[in-house]
Amino acid sequence: MPEFRMIDCGGAKLRCVIEGSGPLVVMVHGFPESWYSWRHQIGQIAASGFTACAIDVRGYGGSDKPFAVEAYTLEAIAADLIGLADVLSPGEPAVLIGHDWGAPIVWNTAFTNPDRIRAVAGLSVPFAGAPQRPFTEVFREH
């Protein structure tokens, strides 16, 4: 049976649903979802010999909801995932799985912390590679 925990990741407290033991697998939901979108995968991942951890990203569900817009950068959210891994799997690399908006979150986390990530998967979103320039510039052009 999964366990609900609030994990202090350093910059925010995240609500996590955790089941199993073994290498850490963190599941990151999309927009506008929550840990609940992973409810069918948690048990299967745990039964396969992993610690399955589905989170509410900061600003969602039971996790902290900072008021300042600046608190929602990809860097801050990636730091949450690394902080979570430091608590649940200290010194061991984690597997990250992201769906929808969770995909760029896990990709960014892997790009910026390659030594902390064992594997990464993005679901339902095509991988376009590392950004060559800020997305805001691209948006202004169109």
Task: Please give the residue ranges for each predicted region.
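N-terminal cap/lid segment of alpha/beta-hydrolase-fold proteins
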Residues: M1-K13
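Residue-level preference for short coil/turn positions at secondary-structure junctions
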Residues: G10, G20-S21, S48, P90-E92
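Pocket-edge positions in alpha/beta enzyme catalytic cores
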Residues: M6-D8, G30, V69, T73
